Amino acid sequence: MDLEFAVNGERFKIDSVDPSTTLLEFLRLNTPFKSVKLGCGEGGCGACLVVLSKYDPELDQVKECCINSCLTLLCSVNGCSITTSEGLGNTKKGFHPIHKRFAGFHASQCGFCTPGMCISLYSSLANAENNSSKDFTVSEAEKSVSGNLCRCTGYRPIVDACKSFASDVDIEDLGLNSFWKKGESKEVMFKNLPPYNPKDHLVTFPEFLKKKEKVDNGSDHLKYRWTTPFSVAELHNIMEAANSGDSLKLVVGNTGTGYYKDEERFDRYIDISNIPEMSMIKKDEKGIEIGAAVTISNAIDALEKESKSSYVFKKMATHMEKIGNRSIRNSGSIGGNLVMAQSRKFPSDVTTLLLAVDASVYMLNGRKTEKVTLQEFLELSPVLDSKRVLLKVEIPSWTAPSGDDTEFLFESYRAAPRSIGNALPYLNAAFLALVSRQEASRKGVTVEKCFLAFGSYGGDHSIRAIEVETFLTGKLLSYSVLYEAVGLLKGIIVPGKDTLHSEYRKSLAVGYLFEFFYPLIESGHRICSLDSGNKHNNSHVDTVKSLPFLSSSQQVLESNEFKPIGEAVIKVGAALQASGEAVFVDDIPTLPDCLHGAFIYSTEPLAKIKSLSFRENVTPTGVFAVLTFKDIPQQGQNIGSKTLFGPGPLFADELTRCAGQRIALVVADTQKHADMAAKLAVVEYDTKNLEQPILTVEDAVKRSSFFEVHPMFYPEPVGDVIKGMEEAERKIISSELRLGSQYFFYMEPQTALALPDEDNCVKVFSSSQAPEYVHSVIATCLGIQEHNVRVITRRVGGGFGGKAVKSMPVATACALGAYKLQRPVKMFLNRKTDMIMAGGRHPMKINYNVGFRSDGKLTALELTMLIDAGLEPDVSPIMPRNIMGPLRKYDWGALSFDVKVCKTNCLSRTAMRAPGEVQGSYIAESIIENVASSLQMDVDAVRKINLHTYDSLRKFYNHIAGDPDEYTLPLLWEKLEISSKFKERSEMVKEFNLCNVWRKRGISRVPIVHQVMQRPTPGKVSILSDGSVVVEVGGIEIGQGLWTKVQQMVAYGLGMVKCEGNEKLLDRIRVVQSDTLGMIQGGFTAGSTTSESSCEAVRLCCVILVERLKPIMDQMMMEKSGSVTWNILIQQAYGQYINLSASTLYKPEYSSMEYLNYGVGVSEVEVDLVTGKTEILRSDIIYDCGKSLNPAVDLGQTEGAFVQGIGFFMMEEYTTDEKGLVVQQGTWDYKIPTVDTIPKHFNVEIVNTGHHKNRVLSSKASGEPPLLLAASVHCATRSAIREARKHSLSSNFIDGSDSEFELPVPATMPVVKSLCGLYSVEKYLQGKIKGQ
């Protein structure tokens, strides 16, 4: 039977398809709709989202939800309608209001994530419209994108765009946008928003699909088959008929593939979503039955509808809303979740919740239906096999016996890196208890019955703590009883051998048990009834509060001095990015003969490569070739990258020198086949007669393995350190600090497309920040002249430094394949491979000695630093210079340092946004924190006393300090103190900490000084015959708004010709893609200054063009009265054969090419001492942007950089195993910030300071410096932990005032909890028992 469905209203019929084909594969390969992006392949990023619409003929109703097309199997959408972002609106039929508002609120930067964001918002709006009892509120607006990742914006403008559709929004709370000016009335604001009317803007379901009958859409493809049974009996027959050797897969949403990434192909896929018995929801007074094929979202809805009869159901629903993300819940089934937990040890929240309410399950075993408890189901041995099928779950309804003395209490818990985003928990728990009030004489609460369930702690599956339940049953609750229960629990919660943070997980179990029962002890005879909404609130364990809405304020000053420079112009192509029509490299249509590549990489750090083959010595399907270093042309070289400091190899030769090093490129007919083949590769290694690999900086020191650092990248020391130490009244000696790595997590993985061309030429499309270097490396590798190579880069889906050096081998490998095979070769790295090969930020080890006076004034600092550069130099030799720049932000008195760049057998590290600078600035803060702790002084006072005067600034930065009026840091420091109410809030934090035992707050103010350097940049401006303008620059648009600023600069520059209609010039300018044969010497797009350098380059071009046009203009003005239009002027110039194309290479003056950026950040956090969770309550930023070229762009860069910094300091673990191979390999274990982890109140002020004659129209950089301000969050967390440690020690009669500690980076939940005390609950209870 044909597979029939619709995409954006267009009918598609397919008679045969591989059942393993995903919807995303089909959309990208067989339709023109490229808005669906492959960001992770795991359902964890939201880039692939589409709206799935299903028609229910019985109800004559269309149901819509957003789903992950990267996981959804194509066969499962039979009879459905699919809507992509292009289907909402596009350039042809007009953009949807969602697209327009995303553009107008400046909510798109690189644009790779934007279509998925728009689909998420659209789906939520559609659901609200279809659900008459549910308004689209501000809360729903924030949740609508909670499962989507964005690495650029910091989410604030995205949330504002979403909130603009909310029924309860206060429009004045929305941030900077292009729809209204500050101060306009609410009526004007609402009027200027692009209008949204659900009747006009919701997509309609195609009529031809409403007539489609439900029949088995069985699809045969070679040996694989898809079948769709419509009853349990049919399902049984299909399974019985299967051959004994056949592998079967039952399918609902296929979301499990995102976690387990099954490599095997199944002989038969069975879609069970249409079986009524497995898709039903049945309710009665006994409880609820939920079919195994019911989606988690539908189960949540069913539980919420029954919340009036049982608050237990409501609590379960609330917890389940934290599972995965909305799109995963829309597809993933209850039964699938349970089966994965039973058979594959999936860390399930569902099993824990169901265990706590004593749920049962029904299974089909042959033709028999069996009922077992969930506990028995989880413990089945052998595990569930393909002949047994889970049919439904039965959840009993719990109501307390009549009378006032007895209550049922239910609560669930979940500790995860994100509250509502896509994150597996460290541990989950759910408790149900029947408790009774005893007679007044006894004054207490007795546990009559309880179910205590725990999961995700590293065991085989969720469990009931039976021993603890038995112990507590019948007991009158007291401190000693609870202490004994905790002891029993610690013996039950035993994480598996390789479980990360095992002690932390046990601590969570103890903490949650304490949170549940402790209020009952404190309340005396009163029962803390959640049923009545009267949960006892005390200062020991705060009640779980609903998250406050995100709020923000932005202060920017638009300037008319160089109009349109200085205006908050919408980013070029923002609406195009929102609709998904903006073309990235992987979106470029390819010819049918295009091949695809995937890397085979080493898993050993130092080994000889004996052989390379495939499993069972069978060449996988679709493979055309396997290319190694031996396939490089004889005249070429084994080179895959290069920098100023040397080349790096494309492939390992006979010896692999680090885990993750490229060994070969497998080339196949599809990307899917190439990736599968790479997984099936078998590399045989030999480590005999080889030295031990160098895997740590300590090993590098022992073996003197270092890269040379040129003197120009090694700053001079400042002052006399020996004298400074002699003057010190106090010293901290040999203190150690370590900083880890960070992954770029650009939303678009590394991508390239190479096409062979005539006469030994090759054309390459590369997602790169350095096309010029890509160009040179390819020519060198192939052994051809550079004029035979052409590299084109239009836009890059996020870079942050990761698309500079690391993009080169990807493009070069594709070029090698195309050159050798004479066919196009495209490669799109899967997220795992990308993460393994990325290198990331430089880890380092720091030791220091610091001298200071008793008032906190610093006198001297000595630093010893070891930087892990990895195998190749890359750009690592610049690190000493980059680190020391921001570190000098304080007046150290004197400063000396010994920095070594270590060569190790790890993948080479590379420049990541603010490379070295973020580490240097943080090192300074860590030292200041320890000095303050040593002196028992307020750390803010220590910071303030050591801020530079202008004289000391000159001492540490020399001429780069500029003129005295350019040193704005003291002004910013005082200004933010007032605007953030820093002093008042500091006192409020102290008061909060005195009143709360289990939550502590911290607040911190941090300054930054960031040194940047302008670079030579080419530009070209050409005026076409119709008066439109085309612009080329060496800089690459990577989301930072470079094209927008360049467009504004050209409009300003050409506007010097005073023609009629000049005010509309902006709309007539187009910045085009980078082409290395058309624009040479483009260099690296890095270091924050490429935008301003590119702007200056095109400004100089405009000066040339204006000089050529001015005589004609003057002549025309003399010959005719009145004004001259731009079009007439250009026509006249063309008629006179005036050269209307100008190019230049901007070269900044050496004396002024470097300058300093200043900013201050204040952050306040709250730490939960039970879980270690840190919530950022508020962040205030003030940043000196000079005269902003575009305030909207610079604001977006400031917020985005700050949030990326939060990731580095608080969340993102990017570690390696004992062989140096990266451990984190996707969205499941690498957590960047999401909507629910950014500051709840986020206030940013961009200060437009006075003229800086040596800057480009007095502007300053904004891309990297604000990232350093995120250290304020880390320092505030340290402050909160210090308060927790003080209280903990003082509770045990120990003076904790000078308790020194180092807070690692990142300060994840396990780290914070361990510093606050893994055993704080036990100690607290012991103290209570002693005090009785």
UniProtKB/Swiss-Prot annotation:
Record EC number: 1.2.3.14, 1.2.3.7
Pfam family, one: MoCoBD_2
Induction info: Transcripts are induced by dehydration, in rosettes but not in roots. Induction by cold, ABA, sodium chloride (NaCl) and polyethylene glycol (PEG) is dependent of the zeaxanthin epoxidase ABA1 protein (ZEP). Induction by glucose requires the short chain alcohol dehydrogenase ABA2 protein. Repressed by mannitol.
Ranges for domain FAD-binding PCMH-type: 219-400
UniProt-annotated location(s): Cytoplasm
Annotated tissue distribution: Expressed in vascular tissues of all organs, particularly in phloem companion cells and xylem parenchymatic cells. Highly expressed in roots and rosettes, and to lower extent in seedlings, stems and flowers. Expressed at very low levels in siliques and dry seeds. Also detected in root dividing cells (tips and primordia), in mesophyll cells and inside the guard cells.
Job of this protein: In higher plants aldehyde oxidases (AO) appear to be homo- and heterodimeric assemblies of AO subunits with probably different physiological functions. AO-delta may be involved in the last step of abscisic acid biosynthesis, at least in leaves and seeds. In vitro, AO-delta oxidizes abscisic aldehyde to abscisic acid (ABA). In vitro, AO-delta also uses 1-naphthaldehyde, indole-3-aldehyde (IAld), benzaldehyde and cinnamaldehyde as substrate; the AAO2-AAO3 dimer also uses abscisic aldehyde as substrate.
Subunit details: Aldehyde oxidases (AO) are homodimers and heterodimers of AO subunits. AO-delta is a AAO3 homodimer. AAO3 also forms a dimer with AAO2. Interacts with PUB44, and this interaction probably results in targeting of this protein to the proteasome.
Similarity field: Belongs to the xanthine dehydrogenase family.
Protein name: Abscisic-aldehyde oxidase
Organism field: Arabidopsis thaliana
Lineage: Eukaryota, Viridiplantae, Streptophyta, Embryophyta, Tracheophyta
Gene: AAO3
